[in-house]
Amino acid sequence: MSSALLLAPGDLIEKAKRELEQRSITPLLREKGSTEAKSKLKEDGEKKNKSEKEENKIHDDRRVESQKSEGGGPADCQRGAGSRGANCATSTGGGDGSAGARTGIGGGGVGRVDSRSGGRGGQGAASDGKGVGKSKTGADRVANDDATRNVGSSEVSPGGITSGGLQGRGGLVAKSGECGGESLDRIGGCSGNSKTEGEEAKAGGGDRRIGGLATQEIADFVKKKIGVEVQVFSKGMSNLFTVDKSLLKRGGLGREDILHQSDIVKEIRASDKKVKIIPLSTVKRMIAEFGGTEEDEIKAVQTQSSSIRYISNRMEDVSRAKAMFTAPTGDEGWKEVAKAATQRPNIMAYVHEGEGDGLKELLHLIDHI
């Protein structure tokens, strides 16, 4: 029997890998260093340029805002001292408790970060550490109870504290409603994560079902039966799969292998009661748990007399291909390969234009060439 080569789209070869392995057919796939890689490189470059432009725009916007705040606010802030209710970052006159955007706590209203005269009895809460003055009411405290309760608000509270308030000398720590009532850090961000460990574990997929078989010998037996490789149980898994004794005996496993499985089950039940023991009494039950195909079907596939031994989507294999199978595909380089193949006079070409991806038709062709 000659070792023939079949051409087919790359994505179809990927889908058929398990069936090709059963038929002892070697896939020869084109390396992703040609069309796909160039396309991806171009796409990555465009994304990078877009990201850099957006980042530069953000920096420019921040610089403009910074210059505005340093150079003074509206005209009424620069002209007048003591204008009632002016929304200024700095003030040369006292004013009567005007509300500033960058403020601490002042007398009767909000004091200034850069206050030079402090208002009428205003209390400077800025980081320059100026002394505490007297408020209108004569109180020496930093804020009243209403101010403390409303510190998370974005509006000026009755006591005169805004959500942008800094920590004063009295040790008042602001809490923001946006952070779920958690303390703010020095730059105004939330100080911690509000998720619990259990919620994070669930978000990371910690509840997913994970399990294995008792021994490597049993794992080999299962692979032979259904053609699927199953891992051996290890610490941290949530399920232990046990194979029925009669199945193991019929599969050629000895008494020691069967007893070894029983011992492992006893040990796990004693050491970790959270592990679930799942019995597998039939081959169909194995297939339901792990997928795969029954042993008789595997043998039937492996003994089919196909001359195909290689399947490829590479241009360099066109000259030695016996046949070509083509179908609608996402393989970007396949169009050129198929075009080159059809120019050969002695190649057999098969085209799938019906419903589905063409996998079933490809395998049918392989089995009958």
UniProtKB/Swiss-Prot annotation:
The principal location of this protein is: virion
Query: Basic and acidic residues bias located where?
Result: 29-68, 137-148, 196-208
Region (Disordered) residue ranges read: 17-169, 184-208
Identify one Pfam family in the record: Orbi_VP6
- The biased composition feature labelled Gly residues covers 92-111
Instruction: Give the record's keywords alphabetically.
Output: Capsid protein, Inner capsid protein, Virion
| Subcellular location(s) of the protein | Virion
A GO MF term:
structural molecule activity
GO CC terms on record? viral inner capsid
- Which stretches are transmembrane? none
Q: Which family does it belong to?
A: Belongs to the orbivirus VP6 family.
Quote the protein name from its UniProt record.
Protein VP6
Please report the organism this UniProt entry assigns to the protein.
Answer: African horse sickness virus
| Protein encoded by which gene | Segment-9
